[in-house]
Amino acid sequence: DGLWYVTTLNIGPIHDNSLGCAKNLEFRTQVFELKHLKTLSFFNCFVSPKRHPIAIPSNSWDKLGGSLESLEFRSNPGLIGKIPVSFGSLVKLKSLVLLENGLTGNIPTNIGNLINLKRLVLAGNRFVGWIPDSFGGLNELLIYDLSRNTLSGPLPLTLGGLTSLLKLDLSNNQLEGMLPSEISNLKNLTLLDLRNNKISSGLTKSFQGMCSLEELVLSNNPIGGDLMSLEWHNLHNLVILDLSNIGLTGEIPESMSKLKRLRFLGLSDNNLTGTLSPKLATLPCVSALYLNANNLTGELNFPDDFYREVGRRFRAWNNPNLCYPVGLVSASHVPYGVKPCQQQVTLLEHDLRTKLANGNMNQNSQFVASLGFTSYGFGAGIWWVSLVEMLIGLFLNCFL
């Protein structure tokens, strides 16, 4: 009887005291007889999707409904098939993690019955279909990760009901439509990652109410919109902001320089215009600033210290009308791919020509006056020696 009083069963290289995975491991139904089981984990056990594919048993999960609090299948490429509908009977579950397996099909709507869930991770599989609206009732949820699947359809409006949520990652799917205004209810959210989807309809002002956000990643979506439409000082906790390749237009607001905790700012591959405020270079924590492939113009008046600190993590190339002032930047810190301001280059060239011309006139006068070449200074360079040789030849021709 003591065997059946097992509360934790970890199989695979999870902890030092975990059970090892047997070769060609099968999922035994005896597991469902462990009526006191609270934790069940399989890590890197089912690894051969072609030679030895394994499906999660579709029945008997209700036998663990009164005890199981954590169920995890991680890194099992040989684990195939669908999520069993009977998972919906595991009403005491606090953590459901199905990460990087070979699972397919739609996500069962009755997962929304697991109202005690604090962590729901279904990332790195091949799930399809829409995100169930029923997930909006998971009021205790803290971690919500459905990334790296093939989910489609709009973002559910019920997302706004997840008021306890800390991290929401729906990246790398095929989600489309607009960003629902209901996300403004997620006051505790610290991470929102929606990159690599098909979300559109512009930046929503709902972000302004999400004052706890530390990471906002929307890159590679046809969102569109204007940075000027948001009051960036409300997002003062941002550490990572990636809005690359989302179809932005308009100018980069000076108010973004108030994001004092910002370490990464990605605005590349958009249609941004106008000049850059020098205040962007005063962001105290920034270590990467990507502005390349836009239509920014004017002088890049960032101090030399900024380029020394950030180096190649400052990207501003492919802005044809953007330039840097020659006098403000040392040769070793020239921003990569940005040209020097042409007016300054022209002035420098003009000054150089003037000095050279004046130098030639003075040297020629000394040469003609002396006739004995005693006034000539040979430190002027080899090109001047050539000129002297030419003049000597002309002089001799006149008297021979």
Regions found by a protein language model. Name each.
Residues 1-383, 393-400:
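Plant-biased, solvent-exposed loop and capping regions
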Residues 387-391:
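Regulatory modules of eukaryotic transcription factors, especially in plants
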